[in-house]
Amino acid sequence: MATVAPPADQATDLLQKLSLDSPAKASEIPEPNKKTAVYQYGGVDVHGQVPSYDRSLTPMLPSDAADPSVCYVPNPYNPYQYYNVYGSGQEWTDYPAYTNPEGVDMNSGIYGENGTVVYPQGYGYAAYPYSPATSPAPQLGGEGQLYGAQQYQYPNYFPNSGPYASSVATPTQPDLSANKPAGVKTLPADSNNVASAAGITKGSNGSAPVKPTNQATLNTSSNLYGMGAPGGGLAAGYQDPRYAYEGYYAPVPWHDGSKYSDVQRPVSGSGVASSYSKSSTVPSSRNQNYRSNSHYTSVHQPSSVTGYGTAQGYYNRMYQNKLYGQYGSTGRSALGYGSSGYDSRTNGRGWAATDNKYRSWGRGNSYYYGNENNVDGLNELNRGPRAKGTKNQKGNLDDSLEVKEQTGESNVTEVGEADNTCVVPDREQYNKEDFPVDYANAMFFIIKSYSEDDVHKSIKYNVWASTPNGNKKLAAAYQEAQQKAGGCPIFLFFSVNASGQFVGLAEMTGPVDFNTNVEYWQQDKWTGSFPLKWHIVKDVPNSLLKHITLENNENKPVTNSRDTQEVKLEQGLKIVKIFKEHSSKTCILDDFSFYEVRQKTILEKKAKQTQKQVSEEKVTDEKKESATAESASKESPAAVQTSSDVKVAENGSVAKPVTGDVVANGC
């Protein structure tokens, strides 16, 4: 049996082995720096010991890991979003909400096929492998292929190796002249002519309301959002400029560039606030150029480090989108940047739809232009200028004249001349107080028009033409109404497609003439016509009629009807009563002069198109005649007499006629 040492001896032995003195260090280098980093995370050493870590070390900055003399090639694949904490793009409609506080130039491009979200590198400035002069912790090289707003892709850019030269003078960005099409008027870049926040003057009187910008005055310090020093707060009444009016994040405060119309936005060195307009003004005018886009694909364009350069527009009211321009509206391609993200040109057209009220729903997104195959050259408007909230006739004529300028037409009709020549119907003959609303027998139909241009012609000439099936349906209804004793009027409720309203009520006063075509309509596809008389001309919103359902149309609201949809007597009388009692402040008569100018433009274009077709047909006929004569001259000189049984050969001998099985040898 082993002898056990007494407890006193054990304690003495332990005290001899223990030592409270710290071992001498070989050098002043901290212990963590001596350790190998191969198995630093999750690994163990050969003895099975878990390595210890010193959490008091200073974290390594990107500038410590990046050698300024080495070229860092950008990664062609976009990594996962890791700026989510700071409000970077997490949705299709998001942009990073923060910008580099030193005011480094922003990018103005989109990422290519590999990108799944909008991913500008850093906090709002372009991908750049070198450190700006004022950045204490610069970002590393760009990690995604950045493409510009063109229809082609730029190749990768490989910058020259070498440190960033802060002593290089920043060139002053010159003013660029706008590429203005011929005949297009441009608002002068004069601050005195900028409209106030209450409205913009239009014509001689009246004002069109605009959306206020609520842009507060920014702090003049070099930091962002007015917080130059730690603890700095925002001014009273300040609205976060990172959010645009459409709910999208903006990489820089939303600003107004109307004072710099059609020129490049200047960049000054007085601070961030000097790059933005401090007044509440209307959005920028058309055809505004910002700067050359030569810095795509990780190329940083030199600019002032104390002020922001401007970026090309993406979303409406975020950067001042151009109504039309060289590169179209790039960022509007379904809010995704895949194969459809490069120069979408607004579904193949160079005009962007900035006002949904003037969009031709289902017929293109342009403001004045629609289908290029349309002979008229003007798209179909579902609502006229009165939708802007002004009833100034002279202002409407200005809009009409602008249409002709945009389409390349000569400005022949002046405002004064149009006032004298335009014949607006007398308003007293419509919306009469004694118009009856109760009928024992009556028939009602819904009429859907493609545009208000055709409704204008109908009121002007008291005529209408429907589709072939619609004309047959109305013709049968008119014959049936004529056979009823005591009379049976046929009322037509007119509505324009996608307008959200009805424009009036008319009565059919004659049969359909299938053999008479009128040349009034915007398109030449309508055949036949019938006379009518307008009783009520006013704008009646659909919201007043949605409660009326039609049993003969699957109990759908009357506002969801097709052309020549019949309405029963009970529902029809309710609609007539609503039409009469509704007090409307606008009607199509307010835009009558506007549509008069459009009608003249359409007729001129039709005449030119017809003349062009006639000249082309004439040239084609002349070419055919010359080709026939040339082919006849190339034929053999032998003359063949077909009206006789005697054939004259080239040598003058006579060939006897062939009879039966006898062969004529011509001897």
From Swiss-Prot:
Binding site for RNA: K448, S449, Y450, D454, W464, A465, N497, W521, W526, W534
Mutant lacking the gene: phenotype: Aberrant trichome branching with an increase in number of spikes. The double mutant plants ect2 and ect3 exhibit delayed timing of leaf formation and altered leaf morphology.
Disulfide cysteine pairs (residue numbers): none
GO cellular component: cytoplasm; cytosol; nucleus
Effect caused by changing W526A: Abolishes binding to N6-methyladenosine (m6A)-containing RNAs
Keywords from the named record: Cytoplasm, Nucleus, RNA-binding
Matches recorded under InterPro entries: YTH_domain, YTH_prot
Assembly: Interacts (via C-terminus) with CIPK1.
Protein name per the record: YTH domain-containing protein ECT2
Gene source species: Arabidopsis thaliana
Name of the encoding gene: ECT2
